[in-house]
C-alpha cells in the first residue's frame, strides 16, 4: 500500500491527508482548482516537504518527520507534469534514455512500442505535436524503472484532438503495465476512461475515497458536479451485438440489460458505462411498445430536492449498482415517488456513446 499521513501548510490551505492507496491500477485524484491535488503529488514525489507525518511506498519509508526524507531521485517514482518539459537539444531517443537506471534494450523497445514512438526516435521536440511531446515525457518517466508513476493533469495543456490522440496510449499503459499510477485530473471524462480508484480532495482534505464506481455514484460527488452533468457509473459485461442494427447488448450483474450505440468489440469483456442523470426517465409501471430501448427495474433509495426546488435527484438501486435520475418536482409529486418504491428507469440507447463506455482493468 501507499501509506500517507501528512500535514502541510500552503498559504491559506492546510493540506491534511491520512489514507492508504492500493499499489495497483490507476487512482484518480479529483477536486476543484486549489483543492490541493498538485500539492499532494509534489509531496509524494519529494518536490516539497511535509511539515509533519510520514509517507511509505510499500516497505520503503520515503518520509518521516525529522528522521527520513529521501530526495526525488532516490524515491523510484516517475513524474509526468502538465507540460512535457523535454530537453530541446536532445532527440526523442535522447530524451527517453535520459535518467534510465539500467540499459535495457527490451524495456526501451517495449515502452517505445506501447507509446507509438518508433518513427519519432530521431526527431527533436520542436517538430512534435503536444500529444507526441507528452508521450515522450511519459516514456522518459517509465524508463527510469519507477515503482510508482505520478501524473499531474498530463492532458490539461492539450486541445481536444490531442487529448483524444493521447488517451488511448494512457489506457494501454494502465492495462499493460503492472505499475501503480496516481493520476491528478479535474476531467471526469479522463477519470472514466483510466481510473480504477478515486480520491476526492476539498480544501486540502479527503471527502471521498474508494473504488471508482462507489465514489462516482456517491452523495459526496453531487456538490462537485453541475446538476446538468450528474451521472452514474454502471458495471456490465459485453454480451453480443444486435444482428440487424449497430447496437451492442450489455448485461448487468442483476440481470438487467443495456443496449448502447455502436458495435463494441471483445464479447464478455467487463466495462463501465456512464449514464447521464438527465437521460433517465421514470415510470411506476412497466412501459409497453416504447421507442426507448432500455427499461431497468429498480427501487428508489433516496430523494434529493435541488436547491431551487424545481428538480429532484433520485438514487435508484439496480442490484449492486446505483443509478441517478433528474426529474421535475411536479413529476415526483404526481407519481408519488418515495424511498423504497419500485419503479422502471428508462434510458435511450442513443444517449450512451463510445465516450461513455470504458473497459474495466
UniProtKB/Swiss-Prot annotation:
Instruction: Supply the Gene3D superfamilies for this chain.
Output: 2.40.50.100, P-loop containing nucleotide triphosphate hydrolases
Q: Which domain of life is it from?
A: Bacteria
| Domain ABC transporter: start-end pairs | 1-228
Q: Under which main EC class is this enzyme filed?
A: translocase
Quaternary structure per UniProt? The complex is composed of two ATP-binding proteins (ModC), two transmembrane proteins (ModB) and a solute-binding protein (ModA).
By what name is this protein known? Answer: Molybdenum import ATP-binding protein ModC
SMART domains per the UniProt record, alphabetical: AAA (SM00382)
For this UniProt entry, which residues form the secretion signal? none
Lineage of the organism: Bacteria, Pseudomonadati, Pseudomonadota, Gammaproteobacteria, Alteromonadales
The record describes the protein's role as:
Part of the ABC transporter complex ModABC involved in molybdenum import. Responsible for energy coupling to the transport system.
Localization per Swiss-Prot or TrEMBL: Cell inner membrane
- Catalysed reactions, as listed in the record: molybdate(out) + ATP + H2O = molybdate(in) + ADP + phosphate + H(+)
- The species this protein was found in: Shewanella oneidensis (strain ATCC 700550 / JCM 31522 / CIP 106686 / LMG 19005 / NCIMB 14063 / MR-1)
Which annotated residues bind ATP?
A: 31-38
GO molecular function ontology, one term from the record = ATP binding
Instruction: Give the EC number(s) under which this enzyme is classified.
Output: 7.3.2.5
**Keyword annotations for this protein?**
ATP-binding, Cell inner membrane, Cell membrane, Membrane, Molybdenum, Nucleotide-binding, Translocase, Transport
State the membrane topology: Peripheral membrane protein
- InterPro entries xrefs: AAA+_ATPase, ABC_transporter-like_ATP-bd, ABC_transporter-like_CS, Mo/tungstate-bd_C_term_dom, ModC_ABC_ATP-bd, Molybdenum_import_ModC, Mop_domain, P-loop_NTPase
Which is one Gene Ontology cellular component term of this protein? plasma membrane
